[in-house]
């Protein structure tokens, strides 16, 4: 592919386009080409409020690994207090939503999906709570029980933005109420090096690139095989099933590279991360002499024109900016442990001040 200089190109993204990219819009058409999943929609208002509320009350059930003696709420100072410890009348009267009491049908379906698949990875509308993985002991999206799902969704800034965007789209529409959906995908232990983002415009593959921005020395020898697999999948499978011919797809190609899994479909718009490309570049790309799209891989000591728009994103674990020490995660599962951790910190600060 080649590019030419051009003014910054605008790309319109409509509520209708977002709907077409919703998981429930394409999942049935790609069964056998995407991991199994349970889609819960529409979601009751109580569930959406629960995900978006400040603080969380987990389901108290026998066998759960979470042992909350009382609910915890983050204060404005970033510390934690019990729900009844607020200073204002509104804080003292606030009662957190309870999964078992306030949305029992959704709670039951979450448990059923986990029982069916063994473990799940959650997603709300178009956002996966990857930025909240620090809340789970395994530091991943793998949810072994319903409370894992709730912790991820409630702690994710990505999900909070998704809720806000959905409400804004609804206000600008003629629909009676906003439609939210919870997707519980069967957990797959994927190799991040083999996940790729594919950019398709007008039925043509413009280019593809790694989703994980780290260097893997074994990818370069596989470049032609991976590119062929991506092109064949887009033309033979995706374009035959999707209503639009312009989109961004996330795919996974595990060894022996004979099967391509569709993970997600995103709008061809600036709100979708271009990763190793830039959006102005994608809007002006033209086929090269061979007519082959470029598969852009992270090179060793990656610098240059592909990296200039992504400085600071290489050689780093994805979402590492959201990580916290394991002690904090474990303390967050129990109020007594949290109190003990706070006391330990205070003792250390006191010793430091005395020195």
From Swiss-Prot:
GO terms for cellular component: cytoplasm. Regulates the cell cycle in a nutrient dependent manner. The gene is CDC123. GO terms for biological process: cell division. Keywords: Cell cycle, Cell division, Cytoplasm. This is Cell division cycle protein 123. Its main location: cytoplasm. Belongs to the CDC123 family.
């Amino acid at each position: 592919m080649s590019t030419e200089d051009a003014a910054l190109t605008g790309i319109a993204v409509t509520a209708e386009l977002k709907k077409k990219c919703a998981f429930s819009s394409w999942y049935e058409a790609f069964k056998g080409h995407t991991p199994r999943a349970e889609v819960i929609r529409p979601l009751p208002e109580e569930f959406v409020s629960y995900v978006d509320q400040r603080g969380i009350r987990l389901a108290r059930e026998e066998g759960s690994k979470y042992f909350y003696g009382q609910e915890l709420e983050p204060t404005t100072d970033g510390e934690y207090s019990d729900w009844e410890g607020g200073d204002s009348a509104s804080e003292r009267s606030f009662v957190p939503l309870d999964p078992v009491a306030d949305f029992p049908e959704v709670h039951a379906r979450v448990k059923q999906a986990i029982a069916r698949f063994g473990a799940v990875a959650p997603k709300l509308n178009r956002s996966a709570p990857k930025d909240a993985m620090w809340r789970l002991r395994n530091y991943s999206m793998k949810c072994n029980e319903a409370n894992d799902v709730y912790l991820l969704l409630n702690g994710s800034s990505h999900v909070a933005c998704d809720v806000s965007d959905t409400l804004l789209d609804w206000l600008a529409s003629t629909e009676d109420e906003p439609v939210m959906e919870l997707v519980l995908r069967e957990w797959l232990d994927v190799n991040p090096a083999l996940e790729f983002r594919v950019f398709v415009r007008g039925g043509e593959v413009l280019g593809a690139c790694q989703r994980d921005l780290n260097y893997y020395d074994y990818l370069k020898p596989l470049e032609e095989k991976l590119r062929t697999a991506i092109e064949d999948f887009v033309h033979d499978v995706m374009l035959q099933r999707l209503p639009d011919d312009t989109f961004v797809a996330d795919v996974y190609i595990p060894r022996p590279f004979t099967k391509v899994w569709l993970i997600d479909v995103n709008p061809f718009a600036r709100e979708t991360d271009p990763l190793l490309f830039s959006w102005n570049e994608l809007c002006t790309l033209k086929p090269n002499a061979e007519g082959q799209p470029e598969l852009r891989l992270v090179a060793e000591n990656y610098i240059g024109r592909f990296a200039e728009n992504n400085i600071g994103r290489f050689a780093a674990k994805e979402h590492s900016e959201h990580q916290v020490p394991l002690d904090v995660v474990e303390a967050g599962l129990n109020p007594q442990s949290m109190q003990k951790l706070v006391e330990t910190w205070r003792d250390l600060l006191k010793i430091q001040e005395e020195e």
